[in-house]
């Protein structure tokens, strides 16, 4: 279910989608996920897998019947229970095969430059986004950006630490830091990490913790690609109007 907001104004269809918890299918002229899939295809990806829950057949039906993609092949993996983002990654293990693969949120519209750079990277990596650009160029408030994990890297641009905000050191004088919005290029090493980490306090398997484990325990080297770009995030009902306005001129090409 989308985060409630009494000040948000939604039409009847949008209200029904928000209540049903299908954030990615929020109608903003077209389902939001149409735009997400379009930009992933624009970045050069030709095989895409959506991880869905057992009660999310409407998503599968939509893309198999109403909006069948032509630019890429679309597969579905099933997460039996909502046990966290690392568990969702495990659900797609059979799809991933032996190659590098992209992992992103379905409720975030990332800049094509970031996705294309990861596609061309040829090694594990993370797209890091400067806090100032997220606030200035996307639809995220400073309060929300402050909750994202902070990225630290060495002089060679390799990820050294992924810190929760409460564990991060004081920011530099300008307050700008690189943060993670779950935009990754992984190898199969991540599956071992996802299986071996302990659940969080909420009982979920969290992807940031799996990344920390892969780096610290399994020797995975992850290249950090910094971007001064904004994203469009569809977390709460109050995001719908701003996201719809930003996507008004964008074309969907599935």
Language model: regions and residue ranges:
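A structural signal for short hydrophobic beta-strand segments in well-ordered beta-sheet cores
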Residues: 25, 151-153, 224
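Glycine-rich, basic loop-to-helix element that forms the pyrophosphate-binding segment
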Residues: 84-91
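Short helix-capping segments at alpha-helix termini
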Residues: 66-72
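N-terminal glycine-rich phosphate-binding loop and ensuing alpha1 helix
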Residues: 1-59, 74, 79
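Terminal amphipathic alpha-helical/low-complexity segments used for targeting or macromolecular assembly
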Residues: 37, 43-45, 158, 181, ...
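Conserved core of the sugar-phosphate nucleotidyltransferase
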Residues: 111-188, 192, 197
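Active-site acidic Asp-centered loop
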Residues: 104-106
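Short aromatic/hydrophobic "clamp" motif used to bind/position activated sugar donors
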Residues: 101
């Amino acid at each position: 279910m989308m985060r409630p907001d009494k000040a948000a104004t939604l039409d009847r269809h949008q209200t029904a989608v928000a209540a049903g918890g299908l954030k990615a299918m929020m109608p903003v002229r077209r389902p939001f996920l149409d735009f997400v899939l379009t930009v992933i295809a624009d970045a050069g990806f030709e095989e895409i897998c959506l991880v869905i829950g057992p009660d999310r057949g409407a998503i599968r039906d939509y893309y198999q019947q109403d909006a069948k993609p032509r630019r890429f092949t679309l597969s579905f993996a099933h997460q039996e229970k909502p046990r966290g983002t690392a568990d969702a990654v495990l659900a797609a293990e059979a799809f991933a095969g032996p190659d590098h693969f992209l992992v992103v949120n379905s409720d975030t519209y990332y800049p094509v430059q970031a996705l294309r750079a990861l596609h061309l990277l040829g090694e594990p990596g993370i797209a890091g986004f400067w806090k100032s650009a997220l606030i200035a160029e996307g639809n995220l408030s400073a309060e929300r950006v402050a909750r994202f994990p902070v990225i630290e890297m060495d002089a060679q641009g390799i990820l050294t630490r992924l810190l929760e905000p409460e564990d991060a050191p004081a920011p530099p004088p300008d307050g700008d830091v690189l943060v993670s919005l779950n935009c990754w290029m992984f190898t199969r090493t991540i599956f071992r990490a996802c299986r071996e980490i302990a659940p969080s306090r909420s009982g979920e398997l969290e992807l940031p913790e799996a990344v920390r484990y892969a780096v610290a325990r399994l020797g995975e080297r992850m290249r950090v690609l910094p971007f001064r770009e904004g994203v469009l995030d569809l977390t709460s009902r109050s995001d719908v109007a701003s996201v719809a306005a930003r996507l008004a001129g964008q074309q969907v090409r599935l």
